[in-house]
């Protein structure tokens, strides 16, 4: 799959989607994007900057949601032009999709909305690459149906429907907890789409702090290494210069000053894993 000027897939080098959970300001976005671009460049790692203009599914209505679509897209457009990186953001309604698509390079659909047929079709109908997050409640094999909806929407709008990614972000494990089943990464290859692993939301403790979600960021490297060892196309990580001060999802964000070393490990591991055919593909 062609994605933002590079090839994405299990037979291609790992790519990175990373950035703060939510836009916290124009200069903040430009600075974090610049640091991430520099890290990725040193590692030869294809990179897409991620940040949200609105967090529509916060635990509490008192939590910071973001700058809103107009101001948020203006900031993302400046990041794209000034820093020189492709940008990704999530949309929450069908009506938002065309406006967001006019600015960003990749659209993302929230995990909670993966079963919403009209929404999935509308986002794919923009013709932009789409990163579809698998719901915490969904079996990995059920993503076949979600991808079929997206392709239907894209093809009805005159596009080929071949610019879709699927993203694992953990499965509900009792209350206020998630677990990652690495088999799901292999199962979702059956969609024919590049598989992305979200290493930070997978350590989230949904609603675990009462009015906000908790997280166990110490397990981000553990799960990221496991996913890359399984064999994936891309890794997704939310990062922040000081996660304890982040306005959204701080407990599961990986510290930006510690990111380079983790990425370096993942790049080396990815090269090793992809240097030979995956054994399971021979069965």
UniProtKB/Swiss-Prot annotation:
InterPro entries: Aldolase_TIM, DAHP1/KDSA, KDO8P_synthase
HAMAP family xrefs: KDO8P_synth
Keywords of this entry: Cytoplasm, Lipopolysaccharide biosynthesis, Transferase
Lineage of producing organism: Bacteria, Pseudomonadati, Pseudomonadota, Betaproteobacteria, Neisseriales
Primary localization class, coarse: cytoplasm
The protein's name: 2-dehydro-3-deoxyphosphooctonate aldolase
GO biological process: keto-3-deoxy-D-manno-octulosonic acid biosynthetic process
Pathway: Carbohydrate biosynthesis; 3-deoxy-D-manno-octulosonate biosynthesis; 3-deoxy-D-manno-octulosonate from D-ribulose 5-phosphate: step 2/3; Bacterial outer membrane biogenesis; lipopolysaccharide biosynthesis
Catalysed transformations (reactions): D-arabinose 5-phosphate + phosphoenolpyruvate + H2O = 3-deoxy-alpha-D-manno-2-octulosonate-8-phosphate + phosphate
GO molecular function: 3-deoxy-8-phosphooctulonate synthase activity
Gene Ontology annotations for the cellular component aspect, listed alphabetically: cytoplasm
Top-level division of the source organism's lineage: Bacteria
EC numbers on record: 2.5.1.55
Location(s), subcellular: Cytoplasm
Family, per entry: Belongs to the KdsA family.
């Amino acid at each position: 799959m062609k994605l933002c000027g590079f090839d994405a897939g299990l037979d291609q080098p790992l790519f990175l989607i990373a950035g703060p959970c939510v836009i916290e300001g124009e200069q903040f976005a430009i600075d974090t994007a610049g640091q991430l671009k520099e890290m990725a460049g040193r590692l030869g790692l294809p990179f897409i900057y991620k940040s949200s203009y609105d967090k529509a599914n916060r635990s509490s209505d008192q939590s910071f949601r973001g700058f809103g679509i107009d101001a948020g897209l203006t900031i993302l457009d400046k990041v794209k032009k000034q820093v020189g990186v492709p940008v990704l953001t999530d949309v929450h309604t069908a009506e938002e999709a065309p406006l967001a698509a006019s600015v960003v390079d990749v659209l993302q659909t929230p995990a909670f909305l993966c079963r919403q047929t009209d929404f999935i079709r509308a986002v794919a109908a923009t013709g932009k690459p789409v990163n579809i997050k698998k719901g915490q409640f969904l079996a990995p094999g059920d993503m076949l149906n979600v991808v079929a909806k997206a392709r239907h929407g894209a093809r009805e709008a005159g596009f080929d429907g071949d610019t879709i990614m699927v993203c694992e972000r953990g499965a509900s494990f009792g209350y206020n907890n998630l677990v990652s089943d690495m088999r799901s990464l292999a199962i979702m290859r059956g969609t024919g789409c590049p598989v992305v692993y979200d290493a930070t939301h997978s350590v989230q403790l949904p609603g675990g702090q009462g009015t906000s979600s908790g997280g166990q960021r110490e397990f981000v490297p553990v799960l990221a290494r496991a996913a890359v060892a399984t064999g994936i196309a891309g890794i997704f990580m939310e990062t922040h210069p000081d996660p304890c001060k982040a306005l959204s999802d701080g407990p599961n964000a990986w510290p930006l000053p510690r990111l380079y070393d983790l990425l370096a490990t993942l790049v080396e591991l990815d090269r090793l894993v992809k240097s030979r055919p995956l054994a399971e593909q021979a069965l």
